[in-house]
Every structure is written in C-alpha cells, then in structure tokens.
UniProtKB/Swiss-Prot annotation:
NCBIfam families: hisG. GO terms for biological process: L-histidine biosynthetic process. GO terms for molecular function: ATP binding; ATP phosphoribosyltransferase activity. It comes from Pyrococcus furiosus (strain ATCC 43587 / DSM 3638 / JCM 8422 / Vc1). This is ATP phosphoribosyltransferase.
Length: 204
C-alpha cells in the first residue's frame, strides 16, 4: 500500500499510529520524499496536500481536519485520531477587540480562505480574505489585515504578537484518510488496518 504522511507537527505521531497497526515505517533518508521497504511505499508531503494525494490515488493518508475541510477533498474518513488537537480561531489585536458579527469590511489574513469565507458568509458579514502561507500573526502588526484566522494550540504565539482570540471556528484533530477506490479494491486489507488502529488507539 501507499501512504502519504504530513510534514510538520503531525509527522511523528502519524508514524506511531501506523506502527501500532503493524505498519513498520523504515527510517527515511533526510532528503527523501518517497521511501519504502518493498511492501509499502511512503510519501512525505505538505500537510495541505495530503488530502489531494489521497483523493487522486494514494491509498491512505493522515491530515488535520482543518486541511480536509479547507480542501474539500472527496476522501473516505474512517477515523478521528487522538492527536493534532487544536482549534481554528479568529484573532484580533488586543487593543481592537471586536466580535465577528461586527467585522463588516474587515481584511482577514489566513491560510484557510475557503473556511473563512464560508464562516463569514453564514454570518452575512462581508470581509476581504487575504491568503497567506505563513506567519499569519504578523499581518495585523504590519497593517495589511484587521484580523486573522489561524490554528491556535496554546495561544502563546497570539499573545506574543499582541493578538487575542475572539471566536472559535472549529475544533481540529488528525484524521485517517482513505482513497475511495482503494477502499473498495483493497477492502479486507484496509478494513483490517483501520480495525487495528481503532483497537490500538481506542481499545475497541
């Protein structure tokens, strides 16, 4: 089988979960993005690309629910995993605290333009969404945005940049993703894999 693993904060926990299910992940050469052991092949990808790889043919992947929601990829999601817990929230400068319902005309910086647009559309609030790929929390400080939508774990990064959380959009955790065709073609193998993960993680 082919597995796609996310770079960054979910990587080590993803390997642990696979190994609990009996999938041995061989040591990766530092520069290798694809590696394997003859039985399974592993691909290392940007977290935002994992659902896309799974939708388009990689058998199994692990990604945050934030990324899956943002991408809207058509994948089978059999399990929520017990790591990667955080939240996607709206934050503003601490001296300009405003509820989302009063953000009409605001510029919002985020890596999550689709989720952000949907959230404010549901509130009937018109905002301008500015897509950035990193250091989102700097946008209000340098004057290019009035607020941000970003992942919050402890809130330390927000505080150190003079920002406060004003609303939670969604809770986030890691998800197991399965390609829909693979799920049918390798039903027994994938079902056994899912069962092993569920038992090792949740005990049932």
């Amino acid at each position: 089988m082919r597995f796609v693993l996310p770079k960054g904060r979910l990587y080590q926990d993803s390997i642990k979960v696979l190994e609990l299910a009996g999938i041995k992940v061989p040591k990766r050469d530092e520069r290798a993005l694809i590696w394997g052991d003859g039985n399974n092949e592993f691909l290392l990808a940007r977290a935002f690309d994992v659902p896309v790889y799974v939708e388009h043919g990689i058998d199994i992947g692990i990604a945050g629910s934030d990324v899956v929601e943002e991408r809207g990829s058509d994948v089978f999601i059999p399990l929520e995993l017990p790591f990667g817990k955080c939240r996607l929230s709206i934050a503003v400068p601490k001296e300009k605290v405003v509820d989302p319902e009063n953000m009409d005309g605001y510029k919002i910086a985020t890596k999550y333009p689709n989720i952000t647009k949907r959230y404010f559309e549901n509130l009937n609030i018109e905002v301008e969404v500015i897509k950035l790929h990193g250091s989102i929390e700097l946008a209000p400080r340098i004057g290019i945005a009035d607020a941000i939508v970003d992942i919050v774990e402890t809130g330390n990064t927000l505080r150190s940049n003079g920002l406060v959380e004003v609303a939670k959009i969604m809770d986030v955790s890691a998800l197991l993703l399965v390609n829909r065709i693979s799920q049918k073609m390798f039903f027994e193998e994938i079902n056994s894999f899912i069962t092993k993960i569920r038992r090792s993680v949740y005990g049932h």
